[in-house]
């Protein structure tokens, strides 16, 4: 039988920053699309009635194709009590019933091509690591939905996890890893169409269908692109429905609050098939770091919401089924008792919407995930389950404001939206089906400034704090940027990047989550700024208390959450009729852009370090000011520097401080000598261990790292 076109975008670099905890370099924030038409034929087997515990097959992973099986992997390394691991890599093929109420929430699923059984088909890459002898494992699995196709688990796993984790053969690194010594199985799978079509370097991809009108004709509609740093051409997420330039508008500006200038039709062109645009004369590059916006009529929308079901059904299949429809055995059949997710940023936003939309209930009615480590995802959703969506996009205080990301409900507990009158929470659906996962919501100061994270802990009117959900804890990593930067690199920012690293805290909280899900042991109390105690404040400098530091710009600019107008029925149908919505300068708290959800930022101490939250040893016993926000250097100054924070060192001596006019005490004035500094540092680390925010192994490393940092710079005398 014939199938309609399937599509997967082609990777393409962008300057939009999404920093990973183990990387100081940028990863692509969104990869663009080159639609490919293909007849994707998936071998259909007769429907087998496989059973697991008396349950019929529900998780519609129909077939897996294994391309790599390496046993043992990790160079044959064997962990005491667990033994050796094996690696299994391949492609999984799934199908969805559009009539199943659990799938009905997926926008445009009814308009996707269907097979002879009336099902919608898709496929994705998977990568699995497991003990060869499952009886020696702990019968639990960690699942990571990759960040734009890329694995980020190395942060949690003490350095083992990038690209092809099984290729690591460094015995010292493997011995000190976090997950394998405990016997965890680890899985990754494709879900995000913006990850491209190439599986090179074990990039995790997904092939999704293109929606069409009921009569088979192409769907067209208004689409929008935010463009920064594309070079001489820009590949559109969706091809243009017409090459008529009068149906499109390209604008350009240098600063966020500048008035956009329209580029005349004589200044740009489509390529021959309408899949990209470029400036004229041909070969002219877009100005680096300037803002271009393109609105046009697009065609062939991908059904991106299938990515939610792909995550659900892959994990449900591994957990509850014994084999695929062709009889290929499930490598983890009968072994899994718990599944925990681990994410970094973008896929955490995926799982925010995953929970909200009810996807933690499998098609067989059972729970999929038991616990979620939600690292730097805050209360945002993802640009995925609507027509013309782009999952690779991420809104910050300069970029991507007009992609649907920050929508009510923001919190895990019930609150009332004063704009629409709706009462809802991210956990409302799973509470009804008794399938709610425990979750550790861990985010940084950057998420308050560029992601409006305070909406996760306040009501939408911004007048009161919300209580914890019984299923979640919220942990604010004080003074951190979005991930970990390098304190020797400025990039496009005015100051050096913020080097604070939360990997050790994540391991402690993962351990606490496991105990919570397994034994009911309560994790450490939530730690975050609050309105009630004055640690959550307005962004103006006289409210935050941030000091006047010579050479440091303070703008107080934060991202504002609006209820944007995409057309009268958008929030019911997921289909925009107005795109882009009206959005004009100034962009912060401007009622002209729509009703506002008030948001706030953390208060700082006299050094400029955040007061509330989990304060790392470097923040409790500081040698610098660390911020979660940053300002761009010229020519884009004073725009925000997106995911970056700042590292602003203290003067070494009192004389240096006075000479520069710095109000912050010098290192010498604070500590006097190395002995005092080391003692204070040790106390701070021990207190974090007692509070459950550091494991003993990581505590020793933290002490050694910070002492070495001071001695290598000769900041203090010994006594």
Tell me what each language-model feature is:
Residues 1-37:
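N-terminal secretory signal peptides that target proteins for export/translocation
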Residues 50-53, 156:
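Structural signature of transmembrane alpha-helix termini at the membrane-water interface
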Residues 37-38, 657:
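Long, compositionally biased, charged low-complexity segments
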Residues 60-719:
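C-terminal His-loop and adjacent cap/lid subdomain of alpha/beta-hydrolase
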Residues 41-51:
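Bacterial N-terminal signal peptides
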Residues 54-59:
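Sec/Tat signal peptide C-region and signal peptidase I cleavage site
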């Amino acid at each position: 039988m014939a199938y309609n076109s399937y599509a997967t975008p082609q990777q393409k670099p962008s300057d939009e920053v999404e920093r990973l905890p183990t990387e100081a370099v940028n990863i692509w924030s969104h990869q663009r699309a080159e639609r490919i038409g293909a007849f994707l034929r998936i071998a259909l087997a007769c429907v087998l009635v496989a059973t697991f515990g008396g349950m019929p097959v529900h998780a519609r992973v129909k077939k897996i194709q294994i391309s790599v099986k390496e046993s043992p992997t990790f160079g044959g390394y064997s962990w005491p009590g667990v033994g050796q691991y094996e690696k299994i890599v391949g492609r999984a093929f799934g199908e969805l019933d559009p009539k199943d109420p659990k799938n009905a929430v997926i926008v445009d699923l009814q308009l996707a091509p269907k097979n002879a059984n009336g099902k919608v088909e898709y496929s994705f890459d998977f990568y699995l690591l497991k003990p060869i002898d499952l009886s020696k494992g702990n019968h639990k699995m960690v699942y990571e939905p990759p960040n734009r196709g890329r694995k980020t688990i190395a942060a949690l796993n003490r350095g083992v996890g990038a690209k092809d984790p099984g290729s690591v053969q460094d015995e010292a690194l493997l011995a000190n890893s976090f997950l394998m010594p405990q016997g965890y199985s680890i899985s990754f799978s494709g879900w995000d169409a913006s990850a491209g079509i190439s599986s090179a370097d074990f990039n995790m991809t997904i092939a999704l269908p293109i929606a069409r009108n009921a009569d088979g004709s192409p769907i067209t509609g208004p689409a929008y692109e935010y463009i920064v740093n594309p070079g001489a051409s820009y590949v559109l997420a969706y091809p243009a429905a017409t090459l008529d330039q009068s149906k499109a508008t390209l604008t350009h500006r240098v600063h966020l609050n500048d008035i956009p200038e329209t580029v005349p039709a004589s200044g740009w062109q489509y390529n021959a098939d309408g899949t990209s645009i470029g400036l004229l004369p041909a070969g002219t590059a877009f100005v680096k770091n300037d803002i271009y916006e393109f609105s046009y009529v697009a065609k062939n929308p991908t059904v991106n919401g299938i990515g939610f079901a792909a995550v659900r059904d892959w994990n449900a299949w591994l957990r509850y089924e014994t084999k695929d429809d062709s009889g290929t055995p499930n490598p983890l059949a009968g072994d899994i008792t718990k599944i925990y997710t681990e994410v970094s940023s973008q896929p955490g936003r995926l799982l925010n919407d995953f929970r909200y939309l009810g996807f933690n209930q499998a098609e067989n009615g059972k729970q999929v995930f038991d616990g979620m480590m939600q690292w730097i995802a805050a209360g945002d959703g993802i640009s995925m389950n609507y027509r013309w969506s782009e999952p690779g996009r991420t809104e910050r205080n300069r970029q991507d404001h007009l992609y649907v990301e920050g929508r009510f409900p923001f919190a895990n507990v019930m609150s009332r939206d004063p704009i629409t009158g709706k009462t809802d929470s991210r956990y409302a659906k799973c509470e009804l089906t008794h399938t709610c996962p425990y979750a550790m919501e861990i985010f940084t100061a950057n998420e308050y400034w560029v992601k409006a994270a305070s909406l996760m802990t306040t009501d939408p009117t911004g007048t009161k704090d919300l209580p914890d959900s019984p299923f979640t804890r919220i942990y604010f990593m004080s003074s951190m940027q979005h991930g970990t930067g390098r304190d020797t690199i400025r990039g496009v920012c005015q100051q050096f990047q913020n080097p604070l690293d939360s990997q050790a805290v994540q391991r402690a909280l993962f351990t606490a989550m496991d105990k919570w899900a397994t034994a009911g042991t309560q994790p450490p109390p939530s730690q975050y700024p609050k309105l009630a105690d004055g640690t959550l404040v307005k962004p103006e400098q006289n409210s935050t208390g941030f000091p006047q530091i010579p050479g440091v710009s303070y703008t107080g600019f934060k991202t504002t959450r609006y209820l944007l107008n995409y057309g009268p029925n958008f929030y019911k149908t997921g289909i925009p009729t107005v795109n882009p919505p009206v959005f004009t300068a100034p962009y912060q708290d401007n009622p002209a852009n729509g009703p506002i959800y008030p948001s706030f930022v953390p208060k700082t101490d006299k050094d400029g370090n955040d007061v509330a939250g989990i304060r790392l040893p470097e923040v409790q016993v500081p040698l610098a000011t660390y911020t979660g926000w940053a300002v761009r250097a010229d020519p884009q100054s004073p725009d925000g520097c997106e995911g970056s924070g700042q590292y602003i060192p203290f003067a070494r001596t009192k004389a240096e401080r006075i000479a520069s006019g710095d109000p912050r005490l010098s290192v010498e004035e604070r500590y006097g000598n190395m002995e005092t500094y080391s003692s204070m540092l040790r106390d701070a680390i021990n207190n974090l261990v007692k509070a459950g925010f550091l494991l003993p192994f990581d505590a020793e490393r933290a002490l050694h790292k910070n002492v070495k940092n001071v001695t290598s710079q000769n900041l203090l005398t010994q006594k």
